[in-house]
């Protein structure tokens, strides 16, 4: 999946002190979150449990250096607003690698 197909009119990212500081607790930089959205393979899942006020999604992907992250985000005014980001846990890495393999074999 490509972000350009998922969000063809993407206008960038929306950062503020709140989402920056939350990610730093997990030692994840803003630029790492952004890289995840532009590297393939990319696995995006809806997050209905946390989508009360707005639709949230979780993206599983990797940075340019290969760090595997889960980034929870929402879309606001054609911008990606990152809610949280952290390293994938072991089972999430297994899920991501399996889903990524399926994408490649399509």
Task: Describe every region a protein language model picked out.
Residues 1-106:
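Ribonuclease/tRNase effector modules and their secretory precursors
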């Amino acid at each position: 999946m490509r972000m350009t197909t998922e969000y063809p009119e993407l206008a960038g990212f929306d950062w503020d002190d709140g989402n920056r500081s939350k990610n730093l607790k997990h030692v994840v930089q803003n630029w790492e979150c952004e890289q995840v959205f532009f590297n393939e393979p990319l696995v995006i899942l809806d997050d209905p449990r946390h989508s009360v006020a707005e639709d949230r999604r979780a993206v599983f992907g990797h940075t340019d250096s290969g760090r595997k992250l889960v980034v929870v985000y929402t879309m606001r005014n054609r911008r990606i607003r990152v809610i949280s980001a952290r390293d994938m846990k072991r089972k999430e890495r297994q899920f991501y690698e399996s889903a990524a393999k399926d994408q490649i074999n399509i």
